[in-house]
From Swiss-Prot:
Scaffold protein that plays an important role in mediating the activation of NF-kappa-B via BCL10 or EGFR. The modification Phosphoserine is found at S18. Residues 138-456 form a coiled coil. This is Caspase recruitment domain-containing protein 10. It is found in: Cytoplasm. The gene is CARD10. InterPro entries: CARD (IPR001315), CARD_CARD10 (IPR042140), DEATH-like_dom_sf (IPR011029), P-loop_NTPase (IPR027417). PROSITE patterns: CARD. One of its GO terms (biological process) is regulation of immune response.
């Protein structure tokens, strides 16, 4: 029973607890319903003191609500305060309602529906009356402080208002002054406009007056001319009248005076009086008449006045007369005024007459002056016209002479074309004859060799063979001289080889044949000198091709017999568009040609595991090797098979390379050597083959993507008008890979930023471009300091050494008869004229590599010191991504060790993670850039150009004293040479764009931001995502 009672009490308590929790939830749900209104209206700074006094929040909660940065606006702070109070349960709800009742009664009424009673029950329960008094005192003190601060603020605002009022008054006064000034300016502008209009009007009036004056001058001139004519006519009439009067007088005298003649004469005299005299006389008579009438009237008035009591009629008559007198007086005054005006007009007319007479005299003087000037100009014009006639005659003569010269020039061009056709025909005939002669001499030499081998003796020792080899080789190379332009003794000696008609030349040829073939009767292989002599006899080329026979030993290509198609002018022009480099190439390339690798293996049998012979030379010699190490004499075949020899065109092969690319290359090589070029082979076989495969794949696909290539080097200019002048780092788009069936490509130059086509033209294909670059490299004058003859004699045998190679799996003492003749090794060189590239638009932030490497650390620091640069850039560890340098091989031809790059993947991942945030500044070289591109990370490569002008500013960036300008320039230019081999595009900062270190950092930053928005050109095959077949 007690247990059941306790259980019942626990259930009642649990039910009461659950009921209170539900009630609290309902209350808070009501508050949450208007949470958005409370959060916008309440100020947490007013509520927190009361809530702290009620002990529902503490100092930490108050600081979190009011001072934390998590809640920047008041709405967030109010919401956080409400969340804290909800966690306090019922006490928090009651304290929140009392705070609302105390500070925000309208919101209290909204929540509860009751009017606020201004009670502080929570404080009384927690603190008691003392706590409430303390709270109220605190609130009063806070309100007093608020009021005091408000009063201070009001005083400050009033003072500020007075200051602003004074400023406003000053501004109003200034505005009034400006308005007055503006009004004055407006008035002045109006006056100026009125003055301008008046000036224009006066100018128009002046112009009209001038026009009127000119018109009056013309009228005056015409009037003067008319007056002259009239005066002449008057003079003639006067003369005629005088004659008639004389005749009449004679007749009157003869007849006597007629009646009334005197009266008629008087009338005539009266008629001849001028009108003005009549007018004056009339006026005088009228004046006298009026004066007389006036006197009579005055006398009558006096008489009437003297008589008293005059009647009214007389008075009226007197008034009438007085009125008439006044009118007469007025008319008299008018007549006087009219007379005065007439006199003034007469005086003005006289003045005008004098003025016109003066102007007439002036005009006469000007007329005489102008007449003299006109005569002078007429004389000058006549002289100029005479000179022009002479010049026209000379011009006609020059045109006739030019036409004659042009006709002669056209005739000379026609004759030149005819001569060219004749020269081509003669060259074709000569080629046929030389071909026939070559075949006959080859057959003769073959027969002689077979005859001598049939009479063979015992075998010589290896030392004697090697001695004869070196002696014959040195003698042969010392005799290989270049012909004299004027036909000196060298040309005479060469005629013995070509078979001249002179007797002593034939004797010398016979002796040389005996000397050459005296060792061929033995079974031991012939010496190198014998091979050279035989090749020279079989190829009757000019003396300038004396070194081209060496390519059968040092290169992999066996020379074809000399054919007409290769020596014609058309084929020569196709290979050498700028002309044949005959003497220059022969002299400039001889020394470098002998410095290449030379290996001649003389043995009786093939070493185990060795390569099979690839071609059979004359006298049964078997050649093997590739075009990098040179052809190698392997063995001499014996028996009937050794007598077989084809003097036809021999096949050109290279070890390990097949396809149309290598065949085209071999044809070009043969064509170059037949024309006297002895250039070494610098072609990259792997690049050529891969490029050719990518080109064939593009040509087969009709809807393939554009085939973009980048020019790695500046190609030589060509004479073809349709050829493009290609410079380094230019992007080309291939349009036609077999343009007109020639060794040219039809391409379009592309803008690397917008991919728009700029201009079109032809460029040499891959093999042709390599040959042109080889010629350009070999013809540089800087590497030609000494003559080829002295260098040939000194270095021909110094670079040769006799070694005994060991066959694979054979003991050390085997095969004592095998001798290997090898020179010093030469480093590999490879000319890649083009590279297959593709454009990429990288949206992520790309890392930055700064070159030269010696300037990168200080330049990175300067870049980070710029304002707001650390928001865009960050520094990565200054360790090379390429790991350790490649270890040099211990022996020539040994495989190169692979670089050990521990932790490379982690560094790559670190760079990839930082790419999306900021530009990563790296201190890497060219090899590190290749590693990044292989991992599909495309950096922005910025190279700072260093010249002699800015080397001092660059030296200040190093931070290490003791550097000389020459050393710094050499190191920076060395890093610039490495840029051309990078698999991605790069940008250079010219020296003229910056003057000091800070300006350089700003320029570099601007270039980085520009390059981030541009396309990046990457070589196909340089990254893992691109197929390796397109690697060029």
């Amino acid at each position: 029973m007690p247990g059941r009672a306790e259980a019942g009490e626990a259930e009642e308590e649990a039910g009461a607890g659950s009921g209170s929790e539900a009630e609290e939830d309902a209350l808070w749900e009501r508050i949450e319903g208007v949470r958005h209104r409370l959060a916008r209206a309440l100020n947490p700074a007013k509520l927190t003191p009361y809530l702290r006094q009620c002990r529902v929040i503490d100092e930490q909660d108050e600081e979190e609500v009011l001072s934390t940065y998590r809640f920047p606006c008041r709405v967030n702070r109010t919401g956080r305060l409400m969340d804290i109070l909800r966690c306090r349960g019922k006490r928090g709800y009651e304290a929140f309602l009392e705070a609302l009742e105390f500070y925000y009664p309208e919101h209290f009424t909204l929540l509860t529906g009751q009017e606020p009673a201004q009670r502080c029950s929570m404080i009384l329960d927690e603190e008691g009356p003392e706590g409430l008094t303390q709270f109220l005192m605190t609130e009063v003190r806070r309100l007093r402080e608020a009021r005091k601060s408000q009063l201070q603020r009001e005083q400050q605002l009033q003072a500020r208002g007075r200051v602003l009022e004074e400023e406003r008054a000053g501004l109003e006064q200034r505005l009034r002054d400006q308005q007055q000034a503006q009004e004055r300016c407006q008035r002045l502008r109006e006056d100026w406009e009125a003055g301008s209009l008046e000036l224009l009007r006066l100018k128009d009036e002046n112009y009209m007056i001038a026009m009127r004056l000119a018109q009056l001058s013309e009228e005056k001139n015409s009037a003067v001319l008319r007056s002259r004519d009239l005066q002449l006519a008057v003079d003639q009439l006067k003369l005629k009248v005088s004659r008639l009067e004389e005749e009449c007088a004679l007749l009157r005298r003869a007849r006597g005076p007629p009646p009334g003649a005197e009266e008629k004469e008087k009338e005539k005299e009266k008629e001849k009086e001028p009108d003005n005299v009549d007018l004056v006389s009339e006026l005088r008579a009228e004046n006298q008449r009026l004066t007389a009438s006036l006197r009579e009237l005055q006398e009558g008035l006096q008489q009437e006045a003297s008589r008293p009591g005059a009647p009214g009629s007389e008075r009226i008559l007197l008034d009438i007369l007085e009125h008439d007198w006044r009118e007469a007086q007025d008319s008299r005054q008018e007549l006087c005024q009219k007379l005065h005006a007439v006199q003034g007009e007469l005086q003005w007319a006289e003045e005008l007459r004098d003025q016109y007479l003066q102007e007439m005299e002036d005009l006469r003087l000007k007329h005489r002056t102008l007449q003299k000037d006109c005569d002078l100009y007429k004389h000058r014009m006549a002289t100029v016209l005479a000179q022009l006639e002479e010049i026209e005659k000379e011009r006609d003569q020059a045109i006739q002479s030019r036409d004659r010269i042009q006709l002669q020039y056209s005739q000379s061009l026609i004759e030149k074309d005819q001569y060219r056709k004749q020269v081509r025909g003669l060259e074709a005939e000569r080629d046929e004859l030389l071909t026939t002669l070559t075949s006959l001499e080859g057959t003769k030499a073959l027969l002689e060799v077979q005859l001598q081998r049939a009479q063979g003796g015992t075998c010589l020792k290896a030392c004697a063979s090697s001695h004869s080899l070196c002696s014959n080789l040195s003698s042969t190379w010392s005799l290989s001289e270049f012909p004299s332009p004027l036909g000196g003794p060298e040309a005479t000696g060469e005629a013995a080889v070509m078979g001249g008609p002179e007797p002593h030349n034939s004797e010398e040829a016979t002796d040389s044949e005996k000397e050459i073939n005296r060792l061929s009767i033995l079974p031991f292989p012939p010496s190198a000198g014998s091979i050279l002599r035989r090749q020279r006899e079989e190829d009757p080329a000019p003396p300038k091709r004396s070194f081209s026979s060496m390519s059968d030993i040092t290169g992999s290509v066996t020379l074809k017999p000399w054919s007409p198609g290769l020596s014609s002018s058309s084929s020569s022009d196709s290979v050498w568009p700028l002309g044949k480099p005959e003497g220059l190439l022969a002299r400039g390339c001889g020394l470098d040609f002998l410095n290449r690798s030379l290996a001649i293996r003389v043995s009786g049998r093939s070493p185990p595991g060795g390569p099979e012979p690839q071609d059979k030379g004359p006298d049964g010699l078997s050649f093997y090797g590739d075009r990098w190490s040179g052809a190698v004499v392997r063995r001499v075949l014996s028996g009937p098979g050794s007598a077989r020899m084809e003097p036809r065109e021999q096949r050109v092969e290279a070890a390990g390379l097949e396809g149309a690319c290598l065949e085209a290359e071999a044809q070009q090589r043969t064509l170059l050597w037949n024309q006297g070029s002895t250039l070494p082979s610098l072609m990259d076989s792997k690049a050529c083959q891969s490029f050719h495969e990518a080109l064939e794949a593009w040509a087969k696909g009709p809807g393939a993507e554009p085939f973009y290539i980048r020019a790695n080097l500046t190609l030589p200019e060509r004479a073809d008008p349709h050829a493009l002048c290609v410079k380094a780092q230019e992007i080309l788009r291939l349009v036609d890979s077999a343009y007109k069936r020639r060794q040219e490509w039809f391409c379009t130059r592309v803008d690397p930023l917008t991919l728009r086509d700029l201009d079109r033209g032809t460029v040499p294909n891959y093999q042709r471009a390599q040959q042109l670059l080889e010629v350009q490299e070999k013809c540089l004058p800087s590497s030609r300091h000494r003559g080829p003859r002295s260098n040939l004699k000194k270095r021909a045998l110094d670079q040769l050494r006799l070694v005994r190679p060991k066959p694979v799996g054979a003991p050390a003492g085997d095969s004592p008869d095998q001798l290997l003749l090898e020179p010093c090794a030469e480093p590999e060189r490879s000319l890649r004229p083009y590279s297959l590239v593709r454009p990429l638009l990288v949206s992520a932030l790309r890392p930055v590599v700064l070159l030269p490497e010696c300037l990168a650390p200080r330049l990175i620091r300067n870049l980070l010191d710029l304002p707001s640069s650390r928001l865009d850039f960050q520094v990565c560890p200054a360790e090379s991504l390429s790991g350790e340098e490649l270890c040099p091989s211990s022996a020539p031809g040994a495989p190169k060790a692979q670089p050990a790059t521990p932790g490379l993947g982690s560094r790559i991942r670190a760079i990839q993670e930082s790419v999306g945030k900021k530009h990563c500044l790296l201190e890497l070289g060219a090899r590190g850039v290749r590693e990044l591109v292989q991992n599909e990370i495309y950096p922005i490569v910025i190279h700072v150009e260093v010249t002699e002008k800015n080397v001092r500013e660059v030296r200040g960036l190093l931070g290490r004293p003791g550097w000389r300008d020459s050393e710094l320039l050499r190191q920076c230019r060395g890093s610039e040479q490495v840029l051309w081999g990078l698999p991605c595009s790069w940008v250079q900062v010219p020296a003229h764009e910056w003057g000091h270190a800070e300006e350089l950092a700003k320029v570099v930053r601007g270039r980085i931001l520009q390059e981030q928005a541009r396309l990046v050109w990457v070589e196909c095959g340089s990254s893992r995502g691109c197929p390796s077949s397109s690697e060029a």
